[in-house]
Amino acid sequence: MDIRTTTTTATDWAGDLLALGFFEDQVELSGSLAELDQKLDGILQELIAETEFKGKAGKSAIARISSKSPIRKIMILGLGKAEDFKLDTLRRTAATIARSAKKEKGKTLGISLPLWNNDPTSTTQAIAEGIELALHQDHRFKSNSEDNNDNHAPEQIQLLGLGDQTTAIERAQRICSGVILARELVAAPANVVTPVTLAETARDLAQEYGLDVEVLGQAECEALGMGAFLGVALASDLPPQFIHLTYRPSGTPRRKLAIIGKGLTFDSGGLNLKTGGSGIETMKMDMAGSAATLGAAKVVGQLKPDVEVHFIVAATENMISGRAMHPGDILTASNGKTIEVNNTDAEGRLTLADALVFAEKLGVDALVDLATLTGACIVALGDDIAGLWSSDDALAEQILQAADHSGEKLWRMPMEEKYFEGMKSQIADMKNTGPRAGGSITAALFLKQFVKETPWAHLDVAGPVWADKENGYNNAGATGYGVRTLVNWVLGS
């Protein structure tokens, strides 16, 4: 698939499918559009009239044109109200166009959409992202090659009237490569993606993009006192892997950042075993935070900003065996704090505790962790929105802006300190869970105990890392949520 920009406008373009975007209640044909309609013998105006097209968001229609026309089919799409026009409108519209072109088996596709904020570069990048992400298909585990219909995707896609935007397209493709890596890591089952697989992925990224990588095994983690992380790993037959991947710019870094991703490649719940109806069969995706972390590393390694970034994953499984940690066990984290385990199914925060301590010791300017941490966050915000907790208002605002620019939905949640009272233990410094109410808040407060002074933010991404059905440029399945927000944050820091 070849995506290019061109100075050619819709009036002069020729190919299989021409897609045009219209704002709501702005569908009158004048100027170049009237000229195009005349060239098409009135088909465009006829399509608008027959479908009662008003330009409302999500509405579209397609018409076939006579064989004598240089354009085989034309598609009109509603963009919604002009005042609500965002970059994500372009992504979602481009996704609809790309899927329609694939369905119509059009090999050449022309797209004419309005500029966002009079910015052809951002407009191009958003359209290219929508196309790349919508057309990504994961067929690794299909035995029937007929299930793979990628050969129907358009071969040539031209973004009309945008001039030369080669750099913006390359940037979009690099960003999408990280999202796709994250999607495919999350989508793969736990017998394919293991802690060792994540470590191998990190090594591959290091080799391909010139990053530094260190993978600590159990003995090295024991030497660093990572009792919380290793407590979770006790029952698994697979070795724990503590992954530290580092991007260093060629010159003096402007800032130093750390991104920490939860890396539970399977979560059985431990001795507090997840039962039928608990979603245990979906727990391959409990490493989505680490997938986003590695996906962001892939992008940063290609874009090469002047910021040093550390990517950290404490990877393991949470399993059951005679070696498993028990409810009631006391673990000692690497900062010396003790934790009474009152629920072995609240294990992600235990692995993150040692990862946060490790990251802060690197002397970074800010820490951000991502984790599929709580079902409570899904109850609060639904499937599409991640929660954000932060000890630092400036950092929180940076991440919110990065998410808004990427189109990944994120909502800041309260850090209600008094709720931590419910996590205090009579025999240890804290318990790993609190009362039922406010579960996503108490989880964030638990993590806060393992960060001293460094500005820190926690993203609970349990909802949006997976889509049960197609939604915008996300196909059903793993979404790669978080990669684009992280990349935008790094680039804007």
Curated annotation (Swiss-Prot):
What keywords appear on the UniProt entry? Aminopeptidase, Cytoplasm, Hydrolase, Manganese, Metal-binding, Protease
Q: Does the keyword Metal-binding apply?
A: yes
Where on the tree of life does the source sit, at the highest rank?
Bacteria
Gene3D superfamilies per the record? Leucine Aminopeptidase, subunit E, domain 1, Zn peptidases
Q: Where does Mn(2+) 2 bind?
A: K262, D267, D286, E347
Q: Which InterPro entries match?
A: Leucine_aapep/pepB (IPR011356), Macro_dom-like (IPR043472), Peptidase_M17_C (IPR000819), Peptidase_M17_leu_NH2_pept (IPR023042), Peptidase_M17_N (IPR008283)
Active-site residues? K274, R349
Recorded catalytic activity of this chain's protein: Release of an N-terminal amino acid, Xaa-|-Yaa-, in which Xaa is preferably Leu, but may be other amino acids including Pro although not Arg or Lys, and Yaa may be Pro. Amino acid amides and methyl esters are also readily hydrolyzed, but rates on arylamides are exceedingly low; Release of an N-terminal amino acid, preferentially leucine, but not glutamic or aspartic acids
Q: Which annotated residues bind Mn(2+) 1?
A: D267, D345, E347
Any single Gene Ontology cellular-component annotation:
cytoplasm
User: Which Pfam families does this UniProt record tie to the protein?
Assistant: Peptidase_M17, Peptidase_M17_N
Role noted for this protein: Presumably involved in the processing and regular turnover of intracellular proteins. Catalyzes the removal of unsubstituted N-terminal amino acids from various peptides.
Family recorded in the similarity comment? Belongs to the peptidase M17 family.
Name of the protein: Probable cytosol aminopeptidase
